[in-house]
Amino acid sequence: MKKQLYQLSNTDIAFPPIECALDSPDGLLAIGGDLSLARLSNAYNNGIFPWFSEDEPIMWWSPSERGIVELDNFHISKSLRKHLKKHPVTVTINNAFIEVIEACCEQRIDTDGTWITSDMLTAYINAHNAGIAHSVEVWREGELAGGLYGIMQNGVFCGESMFHHQTNCSKLAMWALVNWLKRHNAHFIDCQLENPYLMSLGATVIPRPAFLAKLHAAQNYKVDPAMWIPQELNAIYE
């Protein structure tokens, strides 16, 4: 199948075949369209995600290699366990989604710029209100110390971004997420791109066909949507 860049319609939410994604830049499949809930849901169901900067058109990607976290392979270091014992935290889900995504945006601006544009903020807040985007919050002494957010589709959590205001608190958010997903029969976490930080936590990289096969298999994982009712996660690190 010919590799070429497609221009999406504003009315048709369909995507071209993933096999058409470019080799350079790796995985770029299409531009344009919108960030409507229906299009976002269709994208994630097919292993596609949006990634672009404020001054760029909407760009849709499916890279040739995909970073994932197999839930049973998540790595917890001894130092992280010691840190948690010395500095306990409270973990919640969906209690502060807007604060989490805004903190992710601010942290990226402070480091290397951000792809969380104003349109992305609006789109993911809408997805949260519709029940498909979720957040994990880590609190210490009543302050939001770290967290992450992403999209849950069937048995796959598609991680979008994480942040920390205090040492190790993004790792603690990830650890809590992994344990919570395991409790509820989820399949794996899609990290989208290879990331040294996540690789240190046990993420691996697999080729696109293997990823798509796992994504398809995840449709058979029945996950109770009630797992995302806003709540405190008790004994989540046990």
UniProtKB/Swiss-Prot annotation:
Domain of life: Bacteria
Key word Transferase present: yes
Main EC class the enzyme belongs to: transferase
Reactions accelerated catalytically: N-terminal L-lysyl-[protein] + L-leucyl-tRNA(Leu) = N-terminal L-leucyl-L-lysyl-[protein] + tRNA(Leu) + H(+); N-terminal L-arginyl-[protein] + L-leucyl-tRNA(Leu) = N-terminal L-leucyl-L-arginyl-[protein] + tRNA(Leu) + H(+); L-phenylalanyl-tRNA(Phe) + an N-terminal L-alpha-aminoacyl-[protein] = an N-terminal L-phenylalanyl-L-alpha-aminoacyl-[protein] + tRNA(Phe)
Keywords annotated in UniProt: Acyltransferase, Cytoplasm, Transferase
A biological process from GO: protein catabolic process
Pfam families named among the record's database cross-references: Leu_Phe_trans (PF03588)
GO cellular component terms attached to this protein's record: cytoplasm
A molecular function GO annotation: leucyl-tRNA--protein transferase activity
Disulfide pattern: none
Localization per record: Cytoplasm
Cytoplasm keyword on record: yes
Record's signal peptide: none
Entry EC no(s): 2.3.2.6
Family named by the database record: Belongs to the L/F-transferase family.
PANTHER family on file: LEUCYL/PHENYLALANYL-TRNA--PROTEIN TRANSFERASE (PTHR30098), LEUCYL_PHENYLALANYL-TRNA--PROTEIN TRANSFERASE (PTHR30098:SF2)
Functional note: Functions in the N-end rule pathway of protein degradation where it conjugates Leu, Phe and, less efficiently, Met from aminoacyl-tRNAs to the N-termini of proteins containing an N-terminal arginine or lysine.
Stated name of the protein: Leucyl/phenylalanyl-tRNA--protein transferase
Origin species: Pseudoalteromonas translucida (strain TAC 125)
Lineage: Bacteria, Pseudomonadati, Pseudomonadota, Gammaproteobacteria, Alteromonadales
